[in-house]
């Protein structure tokens, strides 16, 4: 499992605009090989968000970043004036995974 995260700092008062942009955009992720899940997380501190995507593997994620699906998803609307600066990307390989489904199967 591979996780890609982007942290965002949203300009004060523009949180609704930021969330609406994410809710209304076409992600093109559902049919991408290796894609498993996407979450947009709102932090406790005002204006702090994280987008988190979960992939079968690093290779699946990297293939997506070179795909037309990636380009199409990132061509939609600008967040200029909504963000305080560019997002900060972090990439992680899963070391341990525990979830309710795995526990239920045990």
Label each residue range with its predicted role.
Residues 2, 39-49, 75-106:
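Glycine-rich beta-strand-turn "strand-cap" elements at beta-sheet edges
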Residues 10-12, 57, 93-96:
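Non-catalytic surface loops within mature trypsin-like serine protease
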Residues 16-18, 50, 61-63, 99-101:
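Short acidic, gly/pro-rich beta-turn/loop elements at beta-sheet edges
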Residues 26-36, 54-90:
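An amphipathic, aromatic/His-enriched active-site/gating alpha helix that lines ligand/cofactor pockets
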């Amino acid at each position: 499992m591979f996780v890609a995260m982007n942290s965002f700092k949203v300009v004060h008062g523009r949180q609704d605009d930021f969330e609406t942009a994410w809710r209304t955009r076409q992600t093109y992720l559902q049919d991408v090989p290796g894609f498993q899940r996407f979450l947009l997380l709102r932090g406790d501190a005002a204006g702090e968000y994280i987008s988190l995507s979960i992939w079968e593997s690093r290779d699946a994620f990297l293939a997506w970043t070179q795909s037309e699906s990636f380009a199409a998803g990132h061509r939609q609307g600008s967040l200029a004036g909504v963000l305080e600066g560019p997002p900060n990307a972090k990439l992680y390989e899963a070391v341990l995974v525990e979830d309710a489904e795995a526990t239920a199967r045990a």
